[in-house]
Amino acid sequence: LPWWSPPSPTWAGNSKTVTQDVVIDTKIDEDGDGNTVAITSITQDTGSSSTDFITNDNTLVFHGTVDLDDDSTLAVTINGVVYTTANGLVIDAQGNWSVDLTGTVLPDGTYPVVATVTDVAGNSKTVTQDVVIDTKIDEDGDGNTVAITSITQDTGSSSTDFITNDNTLVFHGTVDLDDNSTLAVTINGVVYTTANGLVIDAQGNWSVDLTGTVLPDGTYPVVATVTDVAGNSKTVTQDVVIDTKIDEDGDGNTVAITSITQDTGSSSTDFITNDNTLVFHGTVDLDDNSTFSRHHQRRGL
């Protein structure tokens, strides 16, 4: 049989070693402090809360925080544009970030703001915040918001002149319910809402009933203001004049019949005459701002 002998090993001591570190990282929150990324505010937040992200400002700065100790990168998406530190995203040394869009007019609408941090291992965390921009009080665009329409009773020369001799009044108006706004009506320094006397029906007709309150004579600016959740508002004002006295200046004089020509009776002031073509005389107090009319009726002797 053929004989086979294995080659003798060489013992010169040559060797080759390669090393590769493998990093296993399954967490975006590297330092374990619970903080990664947040969207914290906008300027100006004009909603009912300063943190509700509802505004009537359409040139905004968006703010948030990112945990710099997590060694991650941040991208913020607003209105379809991804902002990084290369194109408008600013991050300071404390991890406060901002995107300044004051040079961009954003149309009314709801904008999902998306902030995403990603580390070198590919772990990521995303937070989203809807920002509502609403710059119009007339939400449905029908031209109607709020109006002051009438008082009861309007006893002036016109039924719509808001001049009355009634000092126990009901004030009426309308509000557009489709605008999703709240209404406040101010009368004689008191602000009335649905919590304290303002009544609004299902058709948007509002009223404030002050028939239990005697209002002194004077001019009363009635102010009706609607405000929506974004802080937009519309105000209308109507002066209501209450005048319960004919003697405006309080001097005791209003109107008088003083004489006729010729008064041929036994007294020059007895209004008895044999003249049947007469001139009638009297006085009226011009300071009372009243109108004058005359009426005479003949009675035979």
Regions found by a protein language model. Give the residues of each.
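Surface-exposed, short loops/turns at beta-strand junctions within beta-sandwich domains
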Residues: 1-2, 100-110, 209-219
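Flexible, low-complexity linkers/stalks enriched in Thr/Pro that connect modular domains
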Residues: 16-45, 125-154, 234-263
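Intrinsic disorder
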Residues: 3-11, 77-79, 84, 122, ...
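Short strand-edge motifs at loop-to-beta-strand transitions and within beta-strands
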Residues: 95-99, 204-208
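Short, solvent-exposed loop/linker segments at the N-terminal edge
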Residues: 47-58, 156-167, 265-276
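Aromatic/hydrophobic beta-strand junction motif of beta-rich domains
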Residues: 60-66, 169-175, 278-284
